[in-house]
């Protein structure tokens, strides 16, 4: 039987992308008419609900970036999670303006999200360019604090199981940019 001996749920790596790569991705979003993000899952059609999720997004298909993401997903999965993962889902660049947020949720569920195994979020913004916008997880951190908060360093990546409850707290000043994608495989159940 395969076990997760370290019981890690959130993996963080600094300098996944350079500052110039982050800026290039932020500019890509601004040049490509972002759309309002929808809620996905157990619905007949995806829906928009700004009370739950308020941000914009644009998809990006960059082979070099996709390969780099896949390689890190596979390394983290081999070392820690040990899931059956097979393919990278669409990569999206997200923009959260003042008031932007995403309340507590998971990234896996029914229908098209049922095959999501791992989530990756890359911090594109400089952490001093916005206030609020913390990526929080519904797990206790090493200090005993109830919600673990991910690091906000530009270019860093955070990988975690898609079933792990998380949120982005409301932006109170500035703009937060991030990149998100998922590694998919056969559903857990």
Language model regions located:
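Non-heme Fe(II)/2-oxoglutarate
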Residues: 1-85, 101
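Catalytic core of non-heme Fe(II) oxygenases with the double-stranded beta-helix
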Residues: 66, 70-189
